[in-house]
Amino acid sequence: MSASAATGVFVLSLSAIPVTYIFNHLAAQHDSWTIVGVAALILLLVALLARVLVRRKPPRDPLFYVYAVFGFTSVVNLIIGLEQDGIIDGFMTHYLREGEPYLNTAYGHMICYWDGSVHYLMYLVMVAAIAWEESYRTIGLYWVGSIIMSIVVFVPGNIVGKYGTRICPAFFLSIPYTCLPVWAGFRIYNQPSENYNYPSKVLQEAQAKALLRRPFDLVLVLCLFLATGFCLFRGLIALDCPAELCRLYTQFQEPYLKDPAAYPKIQMLAYMFYSVPYFVIALYGLVVPGCSWMPDITLVHAGGLAQAQFSHIGASLHARTAYVYRVPEEAKIFFLALNIAYGVLPQLLAYRCTYNPEFFLRTKADEKLE
C-alpha cells in the first residue's frame, strides 16, 4: 500500500458532507425503514469505495475498511454536533428528529463531538499506519477502550432512558457499530506487542525497588485508592442510595446524576463495575513486578475514561441539560477539579506503563520458568 491510500480514505470521509445534505432532503420524503436501508447502503458503498482505493495492493489488515467506514461516520457525527449548535443547517435535521432523537440530548451532543474529533484523528492515524505497514497497537488499544465505553453507556441509555419509548428503526444501525469494535479489539490485541530490548540487569534493578523507592508509583497508588472510593460513592448514588451524604452531593455538586436521560446513571454503574475492578488490578500491578499485561489494560482503560469524562463533564454543564440537573454555578470549580483529576489519573498511569515499562516486563529467568 502507498500513502495515497490513506489520503484517499481522508477524502472519502469528507464526502460525508455532500452525502448528508442530500440524504437529509431525501429522508424527509420517506418512512423510517427506508431511511435505515439507505443509510446502511451508504455505509456499504463507503466500504466498497475504500476497497477500490487499494485494489492494486490490498492491505493485509482488514480493519483498514472498518476505519474507512468509521472515519466517514465520524465526519457525520461532527456534522450533527455542528448542526445542533446552529453553526450549520440542513444536513441532518430530519434524521435527528425522526431517526435518532436521543442524539439531541447533551450526552448525545458530546459523544458526537468526541467521535467527530478524537476518534476521527485516531482513524486517520491507524489508516496511515496500515498504509505504511507500521504498528498501531498502542493507539488501537486506546481507541478500543474509548469506543467501547461510549457503546456501553450510549446504547443502554437509549433503551432505558426517557427516549426508550421512542426507539426508531435507525437504532438497529447500532448493531454493526457495537459488533465491529469488539471484533477490531481482538484483532488489535493479537497484534505483536512492542519489543523492549532492555538488558536483564536494568529490569532486575527496576523490579528490585520497593514501592516506597518509586515516588511516582506511590502517588499513583494513593490516587487509585481515592479514585476507587469516588467510583463506589457515585455508583451508590446511581443506585439511589438514601444516605444523607449521597443526597447532599447530588443536590449541591452533581444533580446531573439524576437526569432522566439515564446516561449519567449508566456511566456511574460502568465506573463501579468496570473501573473499580481495574483499579484493584492496577494496584496489584504497581506493587508486584513482572505484570506484563499492565501496559495493555492501562491503555484500554485510559481510552475509556477519557471518552467518559469528556462526555460526562460536558453534558453536566451543557445548555441542553435541564437547568435543575446542571452543575450549580457555585460548585463548578470543585466539580471540574474533581472530575478532571479523575479523568487525568488513568492517562498518567497509561503513560507511566507504556513509556517506562521496565517494572512490568518479565525477565528472561521468569520466561524460562514458564
Curated annotation (Swiss-Prot):
Keywords in alphabetical order, please.
Lysosome, Membrane, Repeat, Transmembrane, Transmembrane helix
Expressed in which tissues:
Broad expression.
Q: Which PROSITE patterns match?
A: EXPERA (PS51751)
Membrane spanning segments where?
A: 3-23, 34-54, 62-82, 110-130, 139-159, 166-186, 218-238, 268-288, 331-351
Described purpose of this protein according to its UniProt entry: May function as sterol isomerase.
**Hey, which family's this protein in?**
Belongs to the TM6SF family.
List the protein's name: Transmembrane 6 superfamily member 1
- Species the sequence originates in: Mus musculus
